[in-house]
Amino acid sequence: MTKKTKATSGADEKTPSLPQYFSWINSTNEGSTEKQTIANLEYFKWLHDKYGMKLKIYAWDAGNLDGAGFYDNPYESEKLKKQYPNTYKPCVDKAAEFGCHLGVWGGADGFGDTPEEEQKRHDLLVHLCRDFGFMQFKFDAVCGWPREEKHLAFKRAIDECRKYVPDLIVLNHRLWLGEGEIACTTFLVDGVETYIDVHVCNEISGPHHRMYPLSRPLIPGLDRLAEDHGVCISSFVDNFEDDLIIQAFSRCLILAPEIYGNPWLIRDDEQARLAKIYNVHAKYSDILVNGMTLSEEIYGHNAISRGDGDTRLITFTNASWLPKTVTISIGEEIALADCEGKEYIVKSIHPYEEYIATAKAGDSVTIEIEPARAALILVQEKSKFEKDDFVLTGCKYETVYGPGATPDKVRIFKADGTIGSIGNRSVDYAAINGDSTIARPVYLGLLKTSPIPANLEQLYEATCFAADCDSLEAQSLKRSGDTKVPEVKAARDAFFNQEAYIYRGTESRAMFDGDSDTYFDAESKFMATRLDGGCLRVDLGKEYDISRIEIESFVVNEPTHEIREAHFEPLAQVSADLANWSDAPLHGVETTLDSYTIPVILASVHLTDHCEGKKCTATYTVNASARYFRLPCPMDRIFSFTAYDMNGNKIDLCAPHANNLLAPFDKVSFISARSLTVTLPEDYADGAYIAIGTDGIHGDEGVYCTIEYDGKQIGAFDRACCYPMNNWEYKAKTANCGFTYYFKLTPDMKGKEVKLHAFYKNECQVVTRAWVCDTNNKQPIAELNI
């Protein structure tokens, strides 16, 4: 194919990267709205005004022009008029307030069957660029496959668009465009999306869910006219920074840094960190286009050096539990040029900023790459560094940028009392000592073959009851907590309050919120996310004397693909201790509302329809003291779960926790076990956790883990690859290797003995090890103005 140039394709291999966000899984195929988009743009404007972060492109994904399987027109479509009653202009204007341009997802055809229809589609695309300054089109096979006879029509339209927006970026997602391909800027690498634990997941054990990006293959030849789908910030957001460092500085494609999803779900303190990555990339964007792969034998897997003859930014990765030592040769080996007699500053930019060394050409500088992390190292000629940059000595820190991307303050995470500075900035400080950096994992030991314990059911149920099967976005919100930033809150609210999210019934709290129209579990049946039929498990928070439990759910009049025939399991069970279970038989099913219309999200297109049916309440007789309730093959679309005391009064549950997708105990079979009894360290920090990781092929859902401490069974609150979940966009990825279970540690467990268990469903050659890991949520010991 003809070599792509700026004239033919909007960019070439030496075009500096364009920083971008795109809206996939902020909405799905139904598309966004003006209100939701404005809320998101206000968030990015806040990042711009507060931290100087520059976003060049905000790209709508599916459903905002074309949809899944159809083409559309914002001036004719009732759907789009409802979404954007004032056309796209209010969103265009809001983006322009902080120097941003819009882009949109669509199909590469839509040119109709007549010359008039072809011209109409042509004119629409040109209009978006000429009148609204659209800077990106993403053309995706999900919309439809372009007809061969329309390839030239596609090319003519894009060529005309570039008369008004010469640097228009056109993404080709999985399409054959023939003669029109030259008009496209990029292709999607391996067709891979990067929604963590939905489309990609860990294949090895690790302390977090983002091990895959640390070992993702490089693009052959370091081709930059490609698209890697960016970094998804929506699920399991811990360590998004490492993922983004690799995307922006290692691959450094034409779109970088590139994120998508829901970045407002990270913590408030992490927002400055996100902006910093964008700001550092912008500072060096002109020279980052020049990259080279370093020797794997010397520098490790996927080490990349980018820059010019005086300045190199080197990205390292470490996809292991142990620190990795790397020795950097200051000279031509990392692509420095004309370096004889020169001195260089070596500075860590990520995961912490830190002065490493002042070195001469020919020197070797040794650094350590933290376990399960990425690292970004700057090597720059000394006089240039002192003019353009700064580094603090005697500490590990991170820079917080202010308006205009100017360094404003530093957060100190570790200091030895001798903080100094090199370069064009200094700090006002008192003597500071302390360390709040993320501690390295502490090895506990290898789990070894042991008899299957007599209380296997109790141990299995402990982890099943601890599991979170809510949407991954709901889990991210719980992880990050409340925000004090109005723009962040508005973007979060816009996401969680959209109908397409609510109608999927992804959060178990709907059963307890007192709202008669919210429900839990709308898609587990037709999405086939239930394991062996699933099991509704409810931890009531504490033990109660219970007479009966009532569960209200929806019963459809005529089953559809999305709403299956209702089923009421005849026998539930309750327990006070997960070991001893008593039966709670179904007493009866009563119609509580004989006519009810429920909204339903249609599969694939994600548009809203409605189905007729009724509300029914199933009553289970308990007459026991219990904390735990389990019901195999449960009903779906559950409006409420209510327990009653022995006097028939409704119990106000203090802290219920529920899930619905893991297999009933009588449907699973474990054939072997391993265990480890170990004394925990005395000095772990608040928020620390135990990780039990299995490396090797264990089979789908092939290993489960639990711990015992002080006579109690403690289940894993999280797992990588994740537990099955009530999905937002798509169901959790299945994985047959690399499971890691995570268990919360409490202060009373310090220095105490615990027993770690692993149970296996298959004969497998695996290694299962345990570690104590530090929390990602570490706060600085000081904050200094610069």
Predicted feature descriptions by range:
Residues E333-Y355, G434, H698-Y704, Q713-D718:
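Short aromatic-acidic-glycine turn motif
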Residues M1, I158-D159, Y164-E354, G362-L376:
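Active-site-proximal substrate-binding groove within the catalytic cores of carbohydrate-active enzymes
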Residues I57-E241:
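Aromatic- and carboxylate-enriched substrate-binding clefts and catalytic-loop regions
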Residues A319-D338, D408-D428:
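Surface-exposed beta-strand/loop patches in extracellular or lumenal glycoproteins
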Residues R273-V280, D286-G291, I298, Y429, ...:
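Disordered, acidic Ser/Thr/Pro-rich linker "stalks" and the adjacent N-terminal cap
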Residues N290-T311, S383-T418, L662-T679:
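Surface beta-strand/loop "capping" patches
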Residues T2-L41, Y51-I57, D61:
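An acidic-aromatic substrate-binding cleft motif
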Residues A357-V410, A430-S471:
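C-terminal beta-strand-rich structural cap/linker in extracellular carbohydrate-active enzymes
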